[in-house]
């Protein structure tokens, strides 16, 4: 975010941005071909935050699409010859705005009057969080222009946060964005302009968005098989097929190659599969420029071995026992492989037709080497057309647009964004949708691993293999529990106390066997897990080794069904059975780490994201949770005061609460003592005259330290006088 100064360096808003709702990374997704795709809703708000009053005339917003084509005027051979010279190649630029949608200007008077009616202030807000302010216009469909009047008047916005909502219906026939093709681009941008008074320059906020198109789940291309069958006379009969014509960018597609040799002694050599991208572009004038670029390739040096699997004990292949290692003559060669499509939109573009200017298609080309009996090599070539499309179920990486969230002024040119100096990292599209299929998808995408095919992501599960499911016999078996983890429904339901004890007993037996095997083999002890074994021994009832021998639980010790999947080999190293603290591990010891963990990726968690990245992820919702200050306030109950009791010969015990020991009570109890006449004794054996004298001395000597220091004695004296007066009245009666 950057502002350039005009006539005044003041009056710059703290925030001026365009925010879209219900979109992922500012991507508008169209579903279906242009003639069948439904319309989509585009909604959002213009966010403005100012720290001082600002006078503005109008706020406008528009969405426009732009196509840019650079047509070279020289042929490739001429360009190569001219590259030797210092003169740059000649090109013809073609720029055109093919789509423009403008919203009505915000009626500021109605907006401010609505705010005054709600809060009595012209948009002022005490909250500094923009997400917490709920200041919205009265209507988004009937916004009137302020520029129509002869003398446009300005309105004053007080200090605070503002958001101006907008919405529009976009047609489904919009051309899609194209960014990574050389010499041709299709981009969409939103532009908001705040027109201010003549003393200040206008403010402009631009935000680039992407319009991407995907195919509908009912499209024929998702289930259409592409196949090429042909024959090379006296050589081979071949068949190459792909199960789905439409392949999502970032996914994988299986490839089947079937070759029948027609001559004896013919051997199969290497196979190369290349994905080519053909794109054509032109401006309104001829000619049409057609170019190709390679997207990815797959090399199979030994296709029979690589496609058939591993060797078994008999020297044959597991998946196809008819294949022999010497590549002798067979009746048929079957090769099944998988081609991984790059997950970056910077390397390839989806199949598209943008107006009559840009056309993109993709094709798979196969190069198969055949080794003849005399030793010379022949090459078989074939091609298959496929369709690449963008799927919201697969996360894609793309380079961010440089002009995103660009702030500029009308009076200035060649502005530079402050964030442009920073290194541009690739951002990921549809990362939220991909998280539904599992976090492993993003991890495999970053590490270059395989990604599930699009048919696995878009189609419902296939139940034709249900005949191999294990039937429930009505009795509880240990096999069903062992094949299910503790976090699965089966493991959580059947994991009783007896089962856990049985599991611990089995684990204790296996650990004992492992220890005996290590002792018999004479393995050297390790000084790493003495404390680890001791911490685990009380639970498993396994005696802790005294020599500090390290105990490792291999896969074989856990049983055949302990977390392993048939046909899948685990790359995870053995894990120490240890819960000891870090200080118990020596400094020179390296603990085994699972190969799937990628610790350098965790370094990104320490980086503070930029404003653009932070706003693209709705971790914090628009509505903040309510606060409950009364409920969370820690109110400590008051402790009641203690009243001490003295001997009855001097004072009387009292149980009166502290709150009632006030001066008013003492003054009211002193009056009966003044009306006492005569010398009478109370039931307690205390002379009433003595009490009167004591009371009079206390009243005449206010500086008595003894009475000041003992308020309990003063209260007891008053109480005694009250009781003496009461007794004297009774005697008179």
Curated annotation (Swiss-Prot):
GO molecular function (one): ubiquitin protein ligase binding
GO BP terms in the entry: cellular response to pheromone; conjugation with cellular fusion; positive regulation of receptor internalization; ubiquitin-dependent endocytosis
Annotated segments matching region Disordered: 518-566, 636-658, 693-733
Motif (PY-motif): 460-463, 625-628
Biased composition (Low complexity): 523-540, 646-658
GO cellular component terms, A-Z: cytoplasm; cytosol; plasma membrane
InterPro entries reported for this sequence: Arrestin-like_C (IPR014752), Arrestin-like_N (IPR011021), Arrestin_C-like (IPR011022), Arrestin_domain-protein (IPR050357)
Organism superkingdom: Eukaryota
Gene3D superfamilies: 2.60.40.640
Pfam families cross-referenced by the UniProt entry: Arrestin_C, Arrestin_N
Domain notes: The PY-motifs are required for the interaction with RSP5 ubiquitin-ligase.
Classification via PANTHER family: ARRESTIN DOMAIN CONTAINING PROTEIN (PTHR11188), FI21816P1 (PTHR11188:SF17)
Role of this protein: Involved in resistance to GST substrate o-dinitrobenzene (o-DNB).
Family recorded in the similarity comment: Belongs to the arrestin family.
Subunit description: Interacts with RSP5 via its 2 PY-motifs.
Designated name of the protein: Protein ROG3
